[in-house]
Amino acid sequence: MGFRDLNLRERQVLGIIIQAYVVTAAPVGSRYIARNYNLGFSDATIRNVMAELEDEGYISQPHTSAGRIPTDKGYRYYVDLIMTFQSLDDNEKKRIEENIGQISIDRKGTSSDVLLSAVKVLGTISRQLSVVLSPTLSNAIFEKLDMVLLSSTRMMVILSIQSLFVKTIVMELDLEVSRQTIDGVVDMLNQRLSGLTLAEIRRSITRRLSGCSCDSGLKNLIVRSAGTLFDESPIFERLYISGTEYIVDQPEFKQPDKVRELITMIEDKFSMAKLVENSGPSRMDITISIGKENCERQAEDLTIVSAPYYVGNMVGKLGILGPKRMDYEHAVRVLNYMADSLSTTLSGVN
């Protein structure tokens, strides 16, 4: 989206319109700006500036109001060229640390416990719909594997990955195996595969298991299933969601059809995960996708603010979803701090 370089007055007025609209959810008029902000120029000058901004598509006039509201283009200019970053306040920092840091201190939680706590506190602090995607696993380090017989024809395989991430898969058996046979295969797999990334295992498992003396039937089953066993979990299984109650309470979603559309989108976990994973243009590590920049039609009235977090060489993602009339500065502050805190916590739970 191309912009000309707005002059100081235009930037001031656009910034004020967005900041006021975020707070009031009401269109902003020139008289409101003149009364509440000491800009040093007249109501007439403000009207002229607003007319110029409207002509260029940064603001628009709702049919029933004399005031103006920001457009997607106006929000994008604000986010890219006006918005400033500040630190999160101490109370919010403390709340984040108390919720997700304690799991690391106690050493009692799993990665899922940490991510569930993270998405809940993210929703509470942002007062928006919040999501966490667990890290992609291709670059994750495999630690160990175990197998549990569920019946004579079914077996659960449990993969332990770095930082307490766990993946489980139920496999159908075409042969009967004893516990002793399973133990032999498990020992061999752990000896030969531990310390490799899942991607390395998928590429080289046949070579790495050649010449072993364990049960060939079970070994061959593992080799044939390597593409599933050592692959990514489906994206919808990596998704944690919280804060639906906050987004449905926003004025933008008071109409029943808008609420139904929103709830339908939230319940589609695959689409929700892809929305966050594919959210738009990036500023540093923070990504902000506004309105029609989103890949799903149902999200054209939303903004998605997301940030990566890191666990060793794995990457996950945090996201805040809300109306375009969002407190962008606060969302960015929360996500920046949460991403750093989550990275530190998960990296410390080995």
Swiss-Prot record:
Keywords: Repressor, Stress response, Transcription, Transcription regulation. Transmembrane segments: none annotated. Gene3D superfamilies: 3.30.450.40, Heat-inducible transcription repressor hrca homolog, domain 3, Winged helix-like DNA-binding domain superfamily/Winged helix DNA-binding domain. GO terms for biological process: negative regulation of DNA-templated transcription. The keyword Transcription applies. InterPro entries: GAF-like_dom_sf (IPR029016), HrcA (IPR002571), HrcA_C (IPR021153), WH-like_DNA-bd_sf (IPR036388), WH_DNA-bd_sf (IPR036390), WHTH_transcript_rep_HrcA_IDD (IPR023120). Belongs to the HrcA family. This is Heat-inducible transcription repressor HrcA. It comes from Pelodictyon phaeoclathratiforme (strain DSM 5477 / BU-1). The lineage of its organism: Bacteria, Pseudomonadati, Chlorobiota, Chlorobiia, Chlorobiales.
